[in-house]
């Protein structure tokens, strides 16, 4: 017999309501948008009913993971739960990063530790369970990549076909995941907004369950807030910094913090700080302008593809979370974000995708403006694993040295300290260094100061010659240019052993006879003679 969670009178313990017009909507009618005004829906609970069923001792003492919060999810049949043991992700206290940034009590919630490497798994737990409750024949989802992989994985566990629509050019790591889980994946020539619109049409036409950044996903993802409170010894932090794309995760976290506050599990609420890249920042822009609506970004352009949602579905919910909590919004450049990604990896050995590094990049301006204080407890949401989009990190990393297999080559690598070469950080890679032909002494000094490499006279001479060639052709030298030149000179200077060398050749021709040719070569140290006619 199915384990029903309805109230004694048979009524559900939750309802779906439109956040704009307030209309109550049956989930069999829609669980995505209001059928009247097409605005997002929200799940409203009977919290007295939840209180009456809640085992507070078990909640406080059982291990941290998403499944322990089943009482807070809108699930009706617990026999149908689709789970991959998501949640229970680590909350790291980052002492080295704290020292560098000046935020003394800095924590990272590493959501990359979820089964598919991203926070989306929490929402997929609820969404795929709802799909099974509703007897879905298939699932359809639009995604910038992370949700595609997560929904595909959970659909596979649930035994449901999964149709995925992603914008063309989605990170290959994310597509590889989704395809490996059995997704029927289509790339759409357009933006995420185009893919999301098309997914809705496909679901309506073919009767598929539409997954995505909708009301039920919010309910699963709010477990991040529950875990943060537990992991901080049942205290809420002063501030939580959240990367935003569609705004769903910001809405989910805020809802989770409010629920634990209202149920008496914590005595305060955090300030919610939303962060976005400057190539796609519609929610923060609306916040900063004091607007009631979110204006869409027609063509997002950012390295943070996971949050490149130009027309955010839950933008209004995210705005409400930031304003209700007394929080704020920050916009960061791609260059600053990639720098933050490297900083987190170097200092704390946490490798996140670019979107997960936006909170790290935002710490400096937040401190400068007084939006966070040095002595406050601050939690940064690291939303996804860096292996989701490894190519992004390579944009600011140096090309590895390539050498011949000799100890002399290794000695040269160590002597020249080639491991010290750092890629021109994206934020200053375009900074001009030379607009006129410099002296060799100036080039050597600049390479040492900018790239950390002390060149020998021979290498300095070659680098100077190439720099001069660039400048004479009217091309000023930036830091990124200098790095490229130095790397290529050092590669070209690597010891090469000739494999094949032509020593001599002789060709004989005549008016009526065939041409005769003879060639003498050295191949791998052995002299070889060859003849041919034709």
Give residue ranges: language-model regions.
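PLP-dependent amino-acid enzyme catalytic core
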Residues: 2-425
